[in-house]
Amino acid sequence: MSIRLQEAGLRHGQVQALNNVDLQIGKGERVAIIGPSGAGKSSLLHLMATAVRPSAGQLDLLGEQPWLLTSGARQRLRARVGLVHQAPPLPPRQRVVTAVLAGRLGQWGTLRGLLNLIHPSDVPGAREVLAELGMVDKLFVQCGQLSGGQLQRVGIARALYQQPEVLLTDEPVSAMDPVLADHSLALLNRHAQAHGVTLVASLHAVELALAHFPRIIGIRAGEVAFDCPAEAVTPTMLDALYANEQLGSPVVPTATVLVQIPRC
């Protein structure tokens, strides 16, 4: 089992971002998380990545309980997990080649990591992953000169170069045009299938989620609304998931009730 959440909750100050989440994601599974803005998709991914600690419940990641480990052991565990941000945090003056190679900083010693900032240690490796994303011509360009969609492709290239066992992607194609978005998600899925990588992506574009991922998890108001194979997701389920999103209506807290989460 790659990821297991048991009654997991997460609070941001007074806001309950996630509540009573139970999920199991096996090795090599490819899963899309969908839901309205503010539903908790990013919070769920960051919880899985150990970027934040659950305020309730338990996370098991790659057979470990991260928050029971020493800080050093937790860092080594994180090196086995890739995280692609919606807006990759890349310094504007950093060259693309350095940004991509930084994917393995958690696996390298301190000296090699520092030397890589001065003289990139694996230019062919960076070039190979960038070529798959149509970005090889940007190898030595500074990140500050790239568009939002290009920066997202650099973030994906960085994660692919890292070669993680679990790859978590948070709205990885939101700034790309439809053709590039489709190509990038297809590439991520091919890579995951070829290498047995567990792939989890949060996506706002439902059509991309259904087209590329065998399993779909719907999140609404910080809770799992449904967990089904893509072919079992119905328009009725989607209507309920996204109800009132276009109106920007706040979620009204309701009394806790016991529900059966559909898992098809």
Curated annotation (Swiss-Prot):
It comes from the Bacteria. The complex is composed of two ATP-binding proteins (PhnC), two transmembrane proteins (PhnE) and a solute-binding protein (PhnD). It is an enzyme of class 7 (translocase). ATP binds at G35, P36, S37, G38, A39, G40, K41, S42. Its main location: membrane. Part of the ABC transporter complex PhnCDE involved in phosphonates import. Responsible for energy coupling to the transport system. SUPFAM superfamilies: P-loop containing nucleoside triphosphate hydrolases. Keywords: ATP-binding, Cell inner membrane, Cell membrane, Membrane, Nucleotide-binding, Phosphonate transport, Translocase, Transport. Belongs to the ABC transporter superfamily. Phosphonates importer (TC 3.A.1.9.1) family. Its EC number is 7.3.2.2. InterPro entries: AAA+_ATPase, ABC_transporter-like_ATP-bd, ABC_transporter-like_CS, MetN_ABC_transporter-like, P-loop_NTPase. It catalyses: phosphonate(out) + ATP + H2O = phosphonate(in) + ADP + phosphate + H(+). GO terms for cellular component: plasma membrane. It is a peripheral membrane protein. GO terms for molecular function: ABC-type phosphonate transporter activity; ATP binding; ATP hydrolysis activity. PROSITE patterns: ABC_TRANSPORTER_1, ABC_TRANSPORTER_2, PHNC. This is Phosphonates import ATP-binding protein PhnC. Pfam families: ABC_tran. It is found in: Cell inner membrane. PANTHER family: AMINO ACID IMPORT ATP-BINDING PROTEIN, PHOSPHONATES IMPORT ATP-BINDING PROTEIN PHNC. Residues 3-246 form the ABC transporter domain.
